[in-house]
């Protein structure tokens, strides 16, 4: 997969993107035939225990992007630019985005609308592919006053449309639409020539993205309406750990089968 192939999928084949934060997850995503792996700054609240994405640092993101690359070296990987890694200056943004490509990302994702058009253009001119992200942008949640659906007012609808067109004009190869009302997401999708990838933005985007922990049911305390739980791995893992604990406590594990003697043959693997 590459930028040009993704762009050609618009209107022909739905794009599938998932988040992944480590090598084993990336390998599974690759083996499942996922088109794009996003190393999201959602790392913060899904893996690092932060309340939201705002505390996530460049250093943390770089570690996880590199891990994902090792797990799926041939995958198309997009790295989220974390809070304040690109907002302070164009020069700083180019420097930070370049770091992601050096550790294995194929592109970066930037939250924000038309006000970041010049920055997107500079990144693209520097050889860094950019995926835009408009609608609900979690890094700006304090400005929105919470996690609210976007596109409900005419003013906001017009802003989102302008932003999508500006990002396209400046060279973005795709745009994530997050929590945008379905009608507006459809209008945006039809108004630009680059793919839109929706999350909580209805049926008419060119692709869909979900967070790893949401679609696999790894967080029992969070069930967003826009997501779908395709598995309940929290319960699967919980039961496995409970069974392990029980067998150790009762002396049922390890058995002779799991032990070595001076007559054992072969190596560690079975």
Swiss-Prot record:
GO terms for cellular component: cytoplasm. Its cofactor is Mg(2+). Pfam families: Pantoate_transf. It is an enzyme of class 2 (transferase). InterPro entries: Pantoate_hydroxy_MeTrfase, Pyrv/PenolPyrv_kinase-like_dom, Pyrv_kinase-like_dom_sf. It catalyses: 3-methyl-2-oxobutanoate + (6R)-5,10-methylene-5,6,7,8-tetrahydrofolate + H2O = 2-dehydropantoate + (6S)-5,6,7,8-tetrahydrofolate. Its main location: cytoplasm. Gene3D superfamilies: Phosphoenolpyruvate-binding domains (3.20.20.60). Binds 1 Mg(2+) ion per subunit. 3-methyl-2-oxobutanoate binds at residues 41-42, 80, 109. GO terms for biological process: pantothenate biosynthetic process. Its EC number is 2.1.2.11. Belongs to the PanB family. Catalyzes the reversible reaction in which hydroxymethyl group from 5,10-methylenetetrahydrofolate is transferred onto alpha-ketoisovalerate to form ketopantoate. This is 3-methyl-2-oxobutanoate hydroxymethyltransferase. It comes from Thermotoga sp. (strain RQ2).
């Amino acid at each position: 997969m590459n930028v040009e192939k993704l762009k050609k999928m618009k209107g022909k084949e739905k794009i599938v993107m998932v988040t992944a934060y480590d090598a084993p997850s990336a390998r599974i995503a690759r083996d499942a035939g996922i088109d794009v792996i996003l190393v999201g700054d959602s790392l913060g609240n899904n893996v690092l225990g932060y309340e939201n994405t705002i505390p996530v640092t460049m250093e943390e993101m770089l570690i996880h992007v590199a891990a994902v690359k090792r797990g799926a070296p041939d995958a198309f990987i997009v790295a989220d630019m974390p809070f304040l890694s690109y907002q302070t200056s164009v020069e700083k943004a180019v420097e930070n985005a370049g770091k992601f490509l050096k550790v294995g990302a194929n592109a970066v994702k930037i939250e924000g609308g038309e006000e970041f058009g010049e920055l997107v253009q500079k990144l693209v001119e520097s050889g860094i592919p950019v995926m835009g992200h408009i609608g609900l942008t979690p890094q700006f949640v304090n400005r929105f006053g919470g996690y609210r659906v976007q596109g409900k007012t005419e003013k906001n609808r017009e802003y989102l449309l302008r932003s999508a067109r500006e990002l396209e004009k400046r060279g973005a190869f795709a745009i994530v639409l997050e929590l945008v009302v379905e009608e507006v997401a459809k209008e945006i999708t039809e108004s630009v020539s680059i793919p839109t990838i929706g999350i909580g933005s209805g049926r008419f985007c060119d692709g869909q993205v979900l967070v790893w922990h949401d679609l696999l049911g790894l967080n029992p305390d969070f069930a967003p309406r826009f997501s779908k739980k395709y598995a309940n791995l929290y319960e699967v893992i919980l039961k496995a750990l409970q069974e392990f604990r029980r067998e150790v406590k009762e002396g049922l594990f390890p058995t002779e089968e799991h032990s070595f003697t001076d007559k054992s043959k072969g190596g560690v693997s079975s």
